[in-house]
Amino acid sequence: MLNCIYTRKLRHNCEKSNLKIQANVRKNLVLVGMMGVGKTTLGKIVSKMTDLKFIDTDANIEKNCLMKISEIFKRKGEKFFRLEEKKEVLKLLKESNSVIALGGGAFIDKTVRDNILKNAISIWLDTNLKDLNKRTKWNNKRPLLNKENNQKEFNKLYE
């Protein structure tokens, strides 16, 4: 697994240079990391630079379930969401030549993790806890953080 540290500077430099990279990838590139690390943002940039299709698993799940993830958590619960997430990721791994932004908790599932490690190129995005907290603090789209002690919960997830 590759370890990348995503920064605003990297994003700016990639967008500014408008660099195109010829990607002869037979496997998917799967971006993995905590919520708020920048998987979707960086995934779109990599997709544009390589002409690979970009897929956001959370967006696909919302489309399939006809509701936002926060609503899925509220109405159906986290267990239902994780099952939908697993089905979506396993389906996407059968395709190729895509940049896939994984939901923050998807890689925790052993089946998902094993399939990604076997059938894709996984790229772990990481940043420090302070930056993650800033990026996710006021985001009400993240159901795992919509609790009273969300700062404590987030720090616990990070560990």
Task: Give the ranges of each region predicted by the language model.
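A glycine- and Lys/Arg-enriched "phosphate-lid" helix/loop adjacent to the NTP-binding pocket
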Residues: N119-E159
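ATP-binding Walker
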Residues: V37
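Extreme N-terminal, non-catalytic leader segments
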Residues: L2-V25
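Walker A/P-loop
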Residues: T40
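ATP-dependent small-molecule kinase phosphotransfer cores
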Residues: K53, T57-A106, K110-L117, R142-P143, ...
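P-loop (Walker A) phosphate-binding loop of NTP-binding proteins
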Residues: M34
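Hydrophobic anchor at the beta1->P-loop junction of P-loop NTPases
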Residues: L31
